[in-house]
Amino acid sequence: LVVSYDWALGGGNLNINLAGNYTETKITKFNFPEKVLASHSQDEFFGPDQINIIETLSPKTKASLGLNYKINKFNFLVRNTYFGEVIRDGFPFGSVQKFAPKVVTDLSVGYDLTKKINFTVGANNLFDVFPDLQVYENSYFGVFKYAPVQMGTTGNYFFGRLNYNF
């Protein structure tokens, strides 16, 4: 669901964008040929780890609220994105782990150098939000501090961008 509203405000234009979704994924049936299952286990092709990736490793809920204000040659963006809880089962070793919901904030400021060229600076994941730490046994024995769930594992990054509109 996406709702967007434009509002003339203070000589500029404020765009308010609200988006959200709820997704529930459940595998209900496998359709392997009988000849294959006669000599192989279903888990060899599609085991508990693959089922977990599809059913629980993506958040069921995700929502975003973005505010984009444009006035004269400037534009300002602030966006908060909510990522819901996810569950990792730890297969083939480890344990079940729930990862708490997180909110990530993006911020940018842009300036129109010409009618066709815009320069923007900003930050994605401004407050350096990370997923919960993995329990030791799920981290491949300390190799991976974070699971690649919800919003990723790279933390914040800052950028400069030059856009040309054709």
Give a label for each model feature:
Residues 80-81, 89-104, 108:
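Generic long, charged, amphipathic alpha-helical segments
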Residues 48-53, 91-97, 145-150:
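Extracellular loop and loop/strand-boundary signature of outer-membrane beta-barrel proteins
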Residues 2-4, 66-68, 77, 108-112, ...:
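Outer-membrane beta-barrel architecture
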Residues 1, 59-63, 101-105, 154-158:
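Residues that define the transmembrane beta-barrel architecture of outer-membrane proteins
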Residues 7, 56, 98, 110, ...:
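Residues embedded in well-ordered secondary-structure elements
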Residues 70, 102, 112-114:
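A short, compositionally biased micro-patch
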Residues 1-90:
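Gram-negative outer-membrane beta-barrel transporters
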Residues 24-27, 81-89, 111-166:
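C-terminal beta-signal and adjacent terminal beta-strands/loops
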